[in-house]
Every structure is written in C-alpha cells, then in structure tokens.
Regions:
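Transmembrane helical elements of multi-pass membrane transporters/channels
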Residues: 1-49, 113, 117-121
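Interfacial segments at transmembrane-helix termini and the short loops linking adjacent helices
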Residues: 20, 85-115
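Membrane-interface helix-loop junctions in multi-pass transport and translocation proteins
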Residues: 21, 93, 134, 141-176, ...
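Interfacial transmembrane-helix starts/ends
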Residues: 27, 59-75, 79-87, 104-107
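Membrane-interface junctions at transmembrane-helix termini in multi-pass inner-membrane proteins
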Residues: 63, 111-139
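Membrane-proximal transmembrane or re-entrant/amphipathic helices at the cytosolic face
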Residues: 179-209
C-alpha cells in the first residue's frame, strides 16, 4: 500500500511541477521495477512461520533466521538491480522503443529503490512479530513526508530523474536510516546494516540453513 501511495505522490507532483510528458516517461520505468515487488512478500510469507515458531524458545536461532531473511531479500534485490542497471537501455528500447529513451536513466535510478522495498518487507514482518506495528505506520509516514519534500526540491531542477532520486532517497530513509532514531526498532537498523556487509551475502550462500 505504501509503495502505491509513493508512486501516486510522485506522479501527481511530476504532473504539477514538470508536465504530463514527464509522467509518462517516469511511469514507464516504474512499471518495470514494480513487477518484482511481490517477490519479497512471497518469500517473507513462506519463511515467516519458521522464524516466529522459535522466537520464544530459541532467541539465538530466531535472530539467526531473521538475519538470513534480511540477507536473502536485500541481496536478492541487489541481484536484480545490478543487471537491470547495465541493461536498462536495451530493456527500454525493446519494450517501449526510441520514444522512451528518457526512461533509461529513470530505470537505472529507480531500480535501486527496490533494495529498500525488499528491506521494508522484512522490517515490517519483524515489527509485527515484536508487536511494534505502530512503527510500521510511523516509518511509512516519515518516508512519504521526505519523498514529498525531496520532490519539491528535485523535480523543478531534474524533472522525472529528480522524482526517481527522491523516491530512492526517501525509501532509504524510511526503510533503513530512520529506524536508528527509535530505540524500540533500532535492532532493525542493525539487522539491515549487517546485511549490507558483502560478507553476509557470501555467508548465506555458504550456510543457507
């Protein structure tokens, strides 16, 4: 739901600040990125029972499984973002043609927001387990507020690219950085920080269970 609101905010503000054409350019790239967004929901949903079942009986195993879910989703997002970044021009030309060449840079920026989208899925699952549901709404509101502010600053100067950067930064702030400022959910920040260490990805491959 939060992702849909972000997209609506971006497109409304783009229309008002940069014109209708920029909305089409932006939407073309965004549609390609959102195709992947159900993936973390499905993965987290399938692994969620194995995490919650050990919460009250084996805290070390609970943390280990939770950390592996963070790592799996975040590095899965990296695995999607890297090739799409390099193949963005080919993808846009094949799917939309030369008329949408301006969507290439949007795709290259916006695809990296997927890392924080994937991260937010596991964050939200963790907050539900810990009975911190109110922080799901709070962090979403913080992310959306920062998105609006950044759109106001960036769109007049950079158009659709500015909106893409605004989304990337606000996702990062709402799904990652802002968790540090709330003691009850600060553990989510540290889970994510550990996940962003490249060693975590290799460790998951070596010890997947």
């Amino acid at each position: 739901m939060a992702i849909l609101i972000y997209m609506k905010i971006d497109q409304v503000m783009l229309k008002e600040l940069a014109g209708v054409q920029s909305v089409g350019i932006y939407a073309a790239a965004v549609k390609l990125c959102e195709v992947w967004y159900p993936i973390p929901v499905l993965i987290a949903g399938s692994l969620y029972p194995a995490i919650i079942v050990v919460k009250d009986t084996n805290f070390a195993l609970y943390n280990s499984r939770l950390q592996k879910l963070y790592t799996l989703l975040v590095w899965g997002a990296f695995a999607l973002a890297i090739p799409i970044t390099f193949l963005a021009d080919w993808i846009i030309f094949i799917l939309y043609g030369n008329d949408f060449s301006d969507s290439i840079i949007i795709l290259r920026i916006y695809v990296w927001a997927g890392i924080f989208v994937f991260l937010s899925v596991v964050n939200n699952k963790w907050m539900v387990i810990e009975n911190y549901q109110k922080y799901i709404l709070l962090t979403s509101l913080i992310g959306m507020s920062s998105n609006i502010l950044l759109n106001v600053i960036l769109i007049p100067h950079y158009g659709a690219s500015g909106a893409a950067f605004a989304t990337l930064i606000s996702y990062g702030f709402g799904s990652y950085l802002c968790l540090f400022f709330f003691p009850k959910i600060r553990a989510g920040f540290w889970f994510a920080t550990k996940t962003l260490n490249p060693y975590s990805g290799f460790a998951l491959l070596k010890h997947p269970k």
